Amino acid sequence: MVLARLLTPSDFGVVTMVTTFSLLFRSFGLNGFTELIMQREGISHSLASNLFWIDLGIGTMLTLAFAGSGPLLALFYHNPAVAQVAEGMSLTIGIGCLGWIHIGLLQRAMRFRAVAVINAIALLLYVIVAIGLAMAGWHYWALVWAAVTHALATATGACCVCRWIPSWPRKASGTGSGFKFAMNVYSHFAFSYITSNTDNLLVGWRYGARPLGFYKKAYDLFVLPQSQLLSPLSAVAVSTLSRVSGDRERFRRYFLQVISVLALLGMGIGADFALVGKDIIRLVLGPGWEEAGRIFTLFGPGIGVMLLYNTHGWVHLSIGRPERWLRWSLLEFGCITSLFLLALRWGPSGVALAWTVSYFLLMFPGFWYAGKPIGLGVGPVLAVIWKFFAASVGAAFMTVLILRAVPAFAMRPGPTGALLRMSSASLLFFGLYFVGVILLHQGPKPLNETARLLRDLLPENTSRRSSPASFGTEGVSAAPARCGEVKSPSNSVQSPAISNRKHDDVNTSVGTSSEPDTRATSNKYSS
């Protein structure tokens, strides 16, 4: 968050006006083709090559179209700087298409650690370039060229690590059906993305770049738990659920145990952020960002529900029903957009509250609709999560009462006061929260399961198995493979490595790629 001290809210706002649109096109190959690579039991070299050229061709057209749309965006936002920023950001679309298929092949080969290293290096380069250019006085251009650097580093790293070379396009079995599957997934992502970015569009259009900059930073912190918790877990969960989708009892058991862990973490983090949100902003972003802190406290209560709600996408994808996912996203779009329009009169704070309300309204209907084909009802989900919700509300209430008894504590000024309030309130809250969880569950079982899952999600562990053994998924784990090796999702037998021969196969897994702007990837499996 050093950038928040070097750039102004208006700088972030101008770039967000553009990335609201550009990240939708930037994610074309990431959302759809990687899921296809995961879903197929075997993918020939010819099919993988066809996917690469389709991705590159469509990506090139999107790059040119977006670069030419700059004047229209500038007219919409009444900000001439938007046109030039759009031209620069268009480069990220075409560059990204060079590496998405390679990322998918690495994920299929269970090489999550390699993908994590690529993403970490790309993010580090993004930060270095952005800070360097910001210190040199480049203002919002620092963010633009940092994004281009990130796209180039991700694509280059993927191609270097996964040394797969596509052949020229040719007729290959499954190209048409595979493309249709990918378009269903991407169509869902597009509706979901439009839904989750309508807030940016409305705030930028109605209130301008500066309020949008405040809102954007608050939103980034809001979805941080999702990108740090849900995205790594999705890489394991979707693959595992796909393999046990034929056994309803195992599917139900694994899914409920995973959302139990997410409920423990999400409800606690969400309630704590609602308590200390303003001080987090003071510490992380520095002076001048107080409005972002007020907005963030309205996001906080929705964090836990957001994490849980977004897991219903795992069900749609793992049972091979992306068309149901797409239909749900249409309903979701109507609901959330209506709430945004109703709340817009109250400014960015009203829109933030609309987000929180929308997750509470949609969570249980979303689980009901996703689980209907396999008999997963709302009752089991509610039975798993209500105790965590009750514990978080009770702990937050007690924390507020205790801290109000120390008025001098609340009035301490400056960063030191913010750090003291944040650390003390968080320690007190989590102490009370964990006590409440243990009492309601009559033991520490949820805490033990969470500890086991977090250990299993460490890179060295996820590179060895596809699912946490502690969640009862014996028989579906898979050994690691090199990029391009074949491994059937139903067993762990390995086949020859991929080459440029016509009938060679490549393997399946799933994951996510990191992005400086959280909007493109944080909801990869969300609705």
Task: Walk through the language-model features, giving the residues of each.
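Hydrophobic transmembrane helix module of multi-pass membrane transport proteins
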Residues: S22-R26, D55-T198
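Alpha-helical transmembrane segments of polytopic membrane transporters and translocases
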Residues: M1, P9-G29, T92, D199-L201, ...
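Membrane-interface junctions at transmembrane-helix termini in multi-pass inner-membrane proteins
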Residues: L36-H45, I95-N119, A136, W141, ...
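Alpha-helical transmembrane segments of multi-pass membrane transport and lipid-handling proteins
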Residues: W53-H78, Q84-G88, I128, G132, ...
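Membrane-proximal transmembrane or re-entrant/amphipathic helices at the cytosolic face
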Residues: W368-G371, L376-V378, V400-R501, D505-T508, ...
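Helix-loop junctions and terminal segments of transmembrane helices
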Residues: S27-H45, Q107-R108, A218, F222-G266, ...
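Membrane-interface helix-loop junctions in multi-pass transport and translocation proteins
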Residues: V2-T19, G70, L75, A83, ...
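Interhelical loop/hinge segments that connect adjacent transmembrane helices in multipass membrane
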Residues: R113, T156-N197, L201, P211, ...
